[in-house]
């Protein structure tokens, strides 16, 4: 829907004004338009609390029976991880790795795979390894999931998440459908078939997933 609307734009208007201070929360006036500066970290964390059972996860994390690591790779997800995992779920400080965003990603490459997230991989394959590990990329839309000395391929993690989504409060009624890009394996297809829901294969690109999300199909 958004993509279709963008193709109908015929002109746009500009207005001269002082720069908006995006570091200060609150509302500002720009001509006849009101601009509100929000805290996306807080808003995102509050949304996640409606989708997942934070009380249950908090109990697991603080039971002494489960340990995890998350590598933000010095990218955008660091502040989100601190808010959710540290402040709301109560993980220990050493749970989060590379959680401070850096313009050069700490000199690394924020691609969550076995090569560039080697620091996390080494932890998960060590003698006293945690039970769960994850890393996310530069803008937080791709991830790598690890178990205790176990690597989960991204296509399989999509299938596992889809198969178990009904166990979370936000998706208790089930999924409308599953979408995957063409390079992704067909593991998710098997889940969709088992659940009796639609499976959409798209070209690579968020605009294709966005259209399905806007239409309520995935």
Residue map of PLM features:
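Gly/Ser/Thr-enriched, mixed-charge loops and adjacent short helices
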Residues: 1-127
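Proline/glycine-rich low-complexity loops and linkers
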Residues: 4-42, 148-218
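Short glycine-aspartate micro-motif
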Residues: 69, 131-135
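Gly/Ser/Thr-rich loops at beta-strand to alpha-helix junctions
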Residues: 73-79, 140-141, 184-186
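Generic structural signal for residues in well-ordered beta-strands
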Residues: 93-94, 134, 199
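Short, high-confidence coil segments that cap the C-terminus of an alpha-helix
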Residues: 128-130, 218
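Short acidic-glycine loop/turn motifs at beta-strand connectors
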Residues: 137-138, 147-149
């Amino acid at each position: 829907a958004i993509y279709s609307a963008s193709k109908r734009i015929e002109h746009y208007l500009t207005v001269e004004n002082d720069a908006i201070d995006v570091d200060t929360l609150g509302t500002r006036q720009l001509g006849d338009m009101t601009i509100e500066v929000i805290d996306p970290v807080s808003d995102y964390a509050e949304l996640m609390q409606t989708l997942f059972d934070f009380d249950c996860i908090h109990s697991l994390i603080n039971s002494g029976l489960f340990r995890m690591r998350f590598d933000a790779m010095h990218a955008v997800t660091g502040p989100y991880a601190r808010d959710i995992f540290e402040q709301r779920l109560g993980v220990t400080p050493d749970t989060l790795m590379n959680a401070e965003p850096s313009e050069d990603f700490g000199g690394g490459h924020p691609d969550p795979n076995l090569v560039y997230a080697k620091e996390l991989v080494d932890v998960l394959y060590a003698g006293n390894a945690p039970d769960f590990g994850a890393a996310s990329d530069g803008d937080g839309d791709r991830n790598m999931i690890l178990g205790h000395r176990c690597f989960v391929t991204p296509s399989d993690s999509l299938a596992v998440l889809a198969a178990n989504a009904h166990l979370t409060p936000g998706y208790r009624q089930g999924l409308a459908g599953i979408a995957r890009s063409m390079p992704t394996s067909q593991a998710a297809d098997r889940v969709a078939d088992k659940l009796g829901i639609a499976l959409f294969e798209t070209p690579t690109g968020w605009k294709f997933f966005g259209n399905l999300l806007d239409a309520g199909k995935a």
